[in-house]
Amino acid sequence: MAVQQKIRIKLKSYDHSLVDKWAEKIIEAVKQTDAIISGPIPLPTESQVFTVNRSPHVDKKSREQFMVASHKRLIEIINPSSKTIDLLMKLELPSGVDVEIKS
Protein backbone atom coordinates (compact mmCIF):
# COMPACT_ATOMS: atom_id res chain seq x y z
CA MET A 1 0.00 0.00 0.00
CA ALA A 2 1.47 3.33 -1.08
CA VAL A 3 1.74 6.22 1.33
CA GLN A 4 -0.47 9.12 0.31
CA GLN A 5 1.03 12.57 0.36
CA LYS A 6 -1.20 15.34 1.75
CA ILE A 7 -1.11 19.11 1.78
CA ARG A 8 -3.20 20.84 4.44
CA ILE A 9 -4.19 24.45 3.83
CA LYS A 10 -5.63 26.32 6.80
CA LEU A 11 -7.31 29.67 6.08
CA LYS A 12 -8.02 32.14 8.89
CA SER A 13 -9.74 35.54 8.81
CA TYR A 14 -11.99 37.83 10.81
CA ASP A 15 -14.45 37.97 7.88
CA HIS A 16 -16.21 34.64 7.18
CA SER A 17 -17.29 35.60 3.67
CA LEU A 18 -13.69 36.33 2.70
CA VAL A 19 -12.54 32.92 3.98
CA ASP A 20 -15.33 31.10 2.12
CA LYS A 21 -14.67 33.02 -1.11
CA TRP A 22 -10.95 32.24 -1.14
CA ALA A 23 -11.48 28.63 -0.10
CA GLU A 24 -13.66 28.20 -3.20
CA LYS A 25 -11.04 29.91 -5.40
CA ILE A 26 -8.32 27.58 -4.09
CA ILE A 27 -10.54 24.54 -4.70
CA GLU A 28 -11.34 25.67 -8.26
CA ALA A 29 -7.64 26.18 -8.99
CA VAL A 30 -6.64 22.79 -7.58
CA LYS A 31 -9.43 20.97 -9.46
CA GLN A 32 -7.75 22.05 -12.71
CA THR A 33 -4.76 19.86 -11.80
CA ASP A 34 -6.93 16.74 -11.15
CA ALA A 35 -5.88 16.45 -7.50
CA ILE A 36 -8.22 14.94 -4.90
CA ILE A 37 -9.69 17.62 -2.62
CA SER A 38 -11.30 17.31 0.79
CA GLY A 39 -13.01 20.41 2.11
CA PRO A 40 -13.49 23.21 2.83
CA ILE A 41 -13.96 21.93 6.36
CA PRO A 42 -15.20 24.62 8.78
CA LEU A 43 -13.14 24.63 11.97
CA PRO A 44 -14.42 26.05 15.28
CA THR A 45 -14.68 29.84 15.43
CA GLU A 46 -12.48 31.43 18.07
CA SER A 47 -14.02 34.40 19.87
CA GLN A 48 -12.28 36.98 22.05
CA VAL A 49 -14.22 39.39 24.25
CA PHE A 50 -12.65 42.65 25.40
CA THR A 51 -14.25 44.60 28.26
CA VAL A 52 -13.36 48.28 28.73
CA ASN A 53 -14.62 51.08 30.97
CA ARG A 54 -16.88 53.56 29.20
CA SER A 55 -15.60 56.46 31.28
CA PRO A 56 -11.93 57.14 32.04
CA HIS A 57 -12.60 58.45 35.58
CA VAL A 58 -15.63 57.13 37.45
CA ASP A 59 -18.52 54.70 36.95
CA LYS A 60 -16.69 51.40 37.26
CA LYS A 61 -20.01 49.60 36.74
CA SER A 62 -20.47 51.12 33.30
CA ARG A 63 -18.52 48.96 30.87
CA GLU A 64 -18.62 48.13 27.21
CA GLN A 65 -17.77 44.79 25.57
CA PHE A 66 -16.27 44.19 22.14
CA MET A 67 -16.02 40.80 20.48
CA VAL A 68 -13.64 39.62 17.76
CA ALA A 69 -14.32 36.28 16.04
CA SER A 70 -11.77 34.52 13.83
CA HIS A 71 -13.15 32.06 11.28
CA LYS A 72 -11.12 29.11 9.99
CA ARG A 73 -11.40 26.64 7.11
CA LEU A 74 -9.31 23.55 6.32
CA ILE A 75 -8.66 22.21 2.82
CA GLU A 76 -6.82 18.91 2.25
CA ILE A 77 -5.21 18.08 -1.08
CA ILE A 78 -4.40 14.38 -1.46
CA ASN A 79 -1.62 13.23 -3.82
CA PRO A 80 -0.73 16.68 -5.22
CA SER A 81 1.35 16.92 -8.37
CA SER A 82 4.13 19.42 -9.00
CA LYS A 83 1.65 21.38 -11.13
CA THR A 84 -0.67 21.65 -8.10
CA ILE A 85 2.12 22.99 -5.90
CA ASP A 86 3.19 25.53 -8.54
CA LEU A 87 -0.41 26.71 -8.86
CA LEU A 88 -0.73 27.16 -5.09
CA MET A 89 2.48 29.20 -4.96
CA LYS A 90 1.23 31.56 -7.68
CA LEU A 91 -2.10 32.35 -5.97
CA GLU A 92 -2.27 35.86 -4.56
CA LEU A 93 -4.49 36.01 -1.49
CA PRO A 94 -5.83 39.25 0.01
CA SER A 95 -4.24 40.77 3.08
CA GLY A 96 -7.25 39.86 5.26
CA VAL A 97 -6.69 36.10 4.94
CA ASP A 98 -3.95 34.23 6.82
CA VAL A 99 -2.78 31.04 5.06
CA GLU A 100 -0.90 28.19 6.71
CA ILE A 101 0.31 25.34 4.47
CA LYS A 102 1.59 22.03 5.88
CA SER A 103 2.63 18.91 4.03
From Swiss-Prot:
InterPro entries, per the entry: Ribosomal_uS10, Ribosomal_uS10_CS, Ribosomal_uS10_dom, Ribosomal_uS10_dom_sf
Organism domain of life: Bacteria
UniProt keyword annotation of Ribonucleoprotein present: yes
GO terms (BP aspect): translation
Recorded GO MF terms: structural constituent of ribosome; tRNA binding
Keywords from the named record: Ribonucleoprotein, Ribosomal protein
Annotated GO CC locations: ribonucleoprotein complex; ribosome
PANTHER family: 30S RIBOSOMAL PROTEIN S10 FAMILY MEMBER
Assembly notes: Part of the 30S ribosomal subunit.
NCBIfam families, sorted: PRK00596.1 (NF001861), rpsJ_bact (TIGR01049)
Purpose: Involved in the binding of tRNA to the ribosomes.
Family per record: Belongs to the universal ribosomal protein uS10 family.
Name of the protein in question: Small ribosomal subunit protein uS10
Protein encoded by which gene: rpsJ
